[in-house]
């Protein structure tokens, strides 16, 4: 359960969990409207998509662009994690992320480790081990339904498996750890365990429960914003933060 959110957000969370929000497919089922097609991604002479909650929060093509709302949600979660980790990390840990001001020469893996066009979302380098250990973390915001998170995890693991091997061949330890957060704020036990790895590396003195709950809260708040703007163009927005986090200057 996520606490400390406005009443409207909590109502959204509860109604979305039982699929009783006023989405077009539900409105048609309740005989309130005759058409349940998504008007945001409809194109003439194409098969229309039904505007379900899954479609609105995770699947609408018009919401998937570089400056669109789903990227904003993903990067808001990533931004909160990055700022929190950098603020609390020990000196032997370096944190890079696929965000402005948190890269190393426009890369998330420093070039002295490997030169690659791949940019995992979060890269943590632990220089306390011999050889140093490189952790590749890739975030996916998934709709919570059977099989979704498992499929996303396997897909991202496969994406970075060859890169992991290349880094090992360059003389480093390397771990490939994709993880998923639910678009409605849910976190599975498996993903909580994956976040434990990040937490122990960077912020062992930070309350872990608060850490993962604020990650989930960020996803939920962003999804509520996406739901509220489901019929409107997206004009962009700064990253959403669930709590005040001190900005960290990139060294």
Predicted segment positions?
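Helix/loop segments that flank and initiate small ligand/metal-binding modules
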Residues: 1-50
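Domain-level recognition of nuclease-like catalytic cores that cleave nucleotide substrates
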Residues: 174-251
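Short beta-strand-loop-alpha-helix junction that forms the active-site gateway
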Residues: 133, 138-155, 181-183
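Conserved, non-catalytic sequence blocks in retroelement Pol enzymes and Pol-derived host proteins
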Residues: 3-6, 26-31, 66-71, 146-152
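Conserved, well-structured core segments
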Residues: 11-14, 39, 122-125, 135-141, ...
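Short Cys/His-based metal-binding microdomains
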Residues: 31-84
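Metal-dependent nuclease catalytic cores in nucleic-acid-processing enzymes
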Residues: 85, 156-171
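Active-site metal-binding core of divalent-cation-utilizing nuclease and nuclease-like domains
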Residues: 28-37, 84-139
């Amino acid at each position: 359960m996520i606490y400390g959110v406005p009443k409207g957000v909590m109502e959204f969370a509860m109604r979305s969990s039982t699929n009783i929000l006023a989405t077009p497919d539900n409105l048609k089922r309740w005989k309130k409207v005759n058409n349940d097609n998504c008007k945001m991604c409809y194109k003439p002479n194409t098969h229309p998509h039904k505007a379900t909650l899954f479609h609105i929060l995770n699947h609408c093509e018009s919401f998937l662009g570089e400056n669109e709302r789903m990227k904003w949600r993903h990067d808001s979660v990533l931004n909160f994690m990055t700022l929190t980790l950098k603020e609390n990390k020990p000196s032997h840990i370096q944190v890079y992320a696929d965000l402005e001001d948190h890269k190393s020469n426009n890369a998330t893996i420093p070039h002295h480790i490997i030169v690659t066009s791949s940019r995992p979302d979060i890269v943590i380098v632990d220089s306390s081990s011999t050889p140093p250990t490189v952790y590749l973390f890739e975030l996916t915001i998934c709709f919570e339904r059977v099989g979704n998170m498992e499929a996303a995890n396997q897909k991202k693991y496969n994406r970075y498996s060859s890169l992991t091997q290349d880094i090992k061949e360059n003389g480093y330890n390397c771990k490939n750890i994709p993880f998923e957060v639910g678009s409605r704020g849910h976190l599975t036990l498996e993903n909580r365990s994956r976040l434990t790895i990040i937490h122990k590396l960077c912020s062992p003195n930070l309350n872990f429960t608060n850490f993962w709950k604020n990650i989930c809260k960020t996803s939920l708040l962003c999804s509520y914003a996406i739901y509220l703007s489901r019929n409107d163009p997206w004009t962009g927005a700064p990253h959403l933060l669930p709590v005040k986090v001190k900005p960290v200057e990139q060294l």
